């Protein structure tokens, strides 16, 4: 028997809505990364985009446990000497809560050509409203 390899047009894509209210950021990002990759499907193939679309609502209500709001944060480098920048999660969640979720999910996806394709299937919104009602997304409890 041959090994099954999924083709991108054979795998049906579904849309899911996840409410981030009161959910820890890391656990939420891990579940989203699994759905975006398609690892929850029996047709999963590592080199093919078999994942589904994910809509995250109420991004501003995501929580971080312990002292991570002030202690941890988002680091990036400007490529100039002494250009290491640090933004604490407290400031990031106040100004751009969507970006905090996107950064966490991006770090949990594989570092290859498919990562940008997976990230295009992630839609994060502040508040309970989203413009994707026409896709008839299913509510997913985490």
From Swiss-Prot:
Pfam families: Ribosomal_L13. The keyword Ribonucleoprotein applies. Keywords: Ribonucleoprotein, Ribosomal protein. GO terms for molecular function: mRNA binding; structural constituent of ribosome. It comes from the Bacteria. InterPro entries: Ribosomal_uL13 (IPR005822), Ribosomal_uL13_bac-type (IPR005823), Ribosomal_uL13_sf (IPR036899). One of its GO terms (cellular component) is cytosolic large ribosomal subunit. One of its GO terms (biological process) is translation. Belongs to the universal ribosomal protein uL13 family. Part of the 50S ribosomal subunit. PANTHER family: LARGE RIBOSOMAL SUBUNIT PROTEIN UL13M, RIBOSOMAL PROTEIN L13. HAMAP family: Ribosomal_uL13. This protein is one of the early assembly proteins of the 50S ribosomal subunit, although it is not seen to bind rRNA by itself. It is important during the early stages of 50S assembly. This is Large ribosomal subunit protein uL13. It comes from Caldicellulosiruptor bescii (strain ATCC BAA-1888 / DSM 6725 / KCTC 15123 / Z-1320).
């Amino acid at each position: 028997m041959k090994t099954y390899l999924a083709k991108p047009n054979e795998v049906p894509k579904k849309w899911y809505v996840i409410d981030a209210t009161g959910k820890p950021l890391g656990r939420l990002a891990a579940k989203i990364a699994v759905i975006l990759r398609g690892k929850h499907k029996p047709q999963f193939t590592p080199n093919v985009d078999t994942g589904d679309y994910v809509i995250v609502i109420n991004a501003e209500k995501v929580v971080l446990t312990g002292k991570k709001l002030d202690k941890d944060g988002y680091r990036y480098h400007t490529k100039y000497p002494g250009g290491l920048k640090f933004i604490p999660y407290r400031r990031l969640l106040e100004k751009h809560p969507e970006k905090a979720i996107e950064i966490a999910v991006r770090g949990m996806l594989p570092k290859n050509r498919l990562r940008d394709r997976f990230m295009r299937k992630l839609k994060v919104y502040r508040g309970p409203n989203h413009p994707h009602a026409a896709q008839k997304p299913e509510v997913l409890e985490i």
